[in-house]
Amino acid sequence: MESENKNNNKKVKEESKVKVKFITNDANIRVTDTPIAVPVRLGRLGLSEVIHHLREEENETSKPFDFLINGKFIRTTLDKHIKNANLSEEQIITIEYLEAITEPKREKECQHDDWVSCVDGSNFGLVVSGSYDLGVRVWGYDGELISTGTGHLAGVKSVCWISDKNADNLSFVSASMDKTLRVWNFNKSQSEIKALACLKEHTGTIESVYVSPDSSRIVSASMDSTIKLWSIKDIPNQHATTSSSIEKSNSKKRRLANNTNNETAAVDQQSEIIHNITESLASVTVPNSQGVTVVNWTTQFQMLSGSMDSKIRLWDVSTLVANDTIPTPAPLTDLDYSMESGLIVTAHKDRIVRIWDPRSSDETKSQTQSLISHKTWVTSVNWNPSSKYHCCSTSHDGTVKYWDIRTKIPLYTIDTLEKSKDKVLSSSFISNKNKNINDYSIVSGGTDSKLRIHYNDKQEQQQ
């Protein structure tokens, strides 16, 4: 009899349950929010089966979900998670669920003649890439090469689309080791790239270029320790001719384009007429920076920079004064700002991805999280444009990692260069739908001279 009681007690313990209420922001997968009792031994897969049962989806039980309690992912059993979070099993626990993001299964490789150092997929369904082969290229969402532009005299380090309401004539800017910026026109109907202007004032390699949210200005950062602002209004559009007068701004006054001491017309390697601009709108030297590696915008009134002196700086655009400086533990190689959350994600030489809240008044608390998974130097970071939680990172370890900042473990890792010792240098998000986080795929480039588009499985199913 005593043995039977022990077995019964053991059985009761194994079947301990807790009352939970499931909630989601996705109406397509919503179930009843009436509290139900579930075994505390369940983990992510067991809870996924519960959701499928409530939705009466017997044929979709293999599709996993992710679950969060108070904003923290469940990565153990319910029992362990509840204890670690100091929650009570006597109360009803609210569990948020969402479709799990899985590793892309399809990939398109796009060959270059040298390292692919930079990519930008922010223009609807198009990717622009820059390479150490001196060229810039525009690719379609399907990985088809549309056009190539040449003119730089050294490797291209950074590229950025310039938003344009004209859907046929687009433009983008590139930055190079030849110390110049070039602005290009891309005519979609003619599948043709033409150079519009060459911006010359930096005295060192230009590491980063970015366009303001209102597409009125370009900011560039260089190893010469300067940040420069350029007015897009000063750059002739695709219809300009050699005889047109081009107005140029600077911080004190405006001069006409026929002043050949400041601007002249020149012919590049493709025999296209381009316009040399030799004075920026404004410039600032970042003292003791050891070189500025990256620039970005928060709004059209504020910029961000990262540098080799391990500091993030927030700049007032109107004065080019750094209103705030955030010290970091290691030199910065890249950063990105989230319009959704107001957070900054940074890449560092010490292999760590870090998340910062620039709104924090205490600089020791402004770092909200460290994401540690890469084995060596992190080269690029990007926020998913439609999510306050998701970002990607690339590294010299040959991987692309996709993160949800509510957990310290990557949602998935793409080993892009598993058969070689090549490095991943750059990344961006691309979409041809632009609706939500599931409509974005990742594009990356590296030292194997290939651009890769890692297609989001859910987006592919919607094509």
From Swiss-Prot:
The keyword Nucleus applies. InterPro entries: G-protein_beta_WD-40_rep, NLE, WD40/YVTN_repeat-like_dom_sf, WD40_repeat_CS, WD40_repeat_dom_sf, WD40_rpt, WDR12/Ytm1. Residues 16-99 are annotated as: Ubiquitin-like (UBL) domain. GO terms for biological process: maturation of 5.8S rRNA from tricistronic rRNA transcript (SSU-rRNA, 5.8S rRNA, LSU-rRNA); maturation of LSU-rRNA from tricistronic rRNA transcript (SSU-rRNA, 5.8S rRNA, LSU-rRNA); response to mercury ion; ribosomal large subunit biogenesis. WD repeats lie at residues 111-149, 151-194, 201-240, 287-325, 327-366, 373-413, 419-463. Its main location: nucleus. It is found in: Nucleus, Nucleolus; Nucleus, Nucleoplasm. It comes from the Eukaryota. Keywords: Nucleus, Repeat, Ribosome biogenesis, rRNA processing, WD repeat. GO terms for cellular component: nucleolus; nucleoplasm; preribosome, large subunit precursor. One of its GO terms (molecular function) is ribonucleoprotein complex binding. Induction: Up-regulated by phagocytic stimuli. Required for maturation of ribosomal RNAs and formation of the large ribosomal subunit. PANTHER family: RIBOSOME BIOGENESIS PROTEIN WDR12 (PTHR19855:SF11), WD40 REPEAT PROTEIN 12, 37 (PTHR19855). This is Ribosome biogenesis protein WDR12 homolog. It comes from Dictyostelium discoideum (Social amoeba).
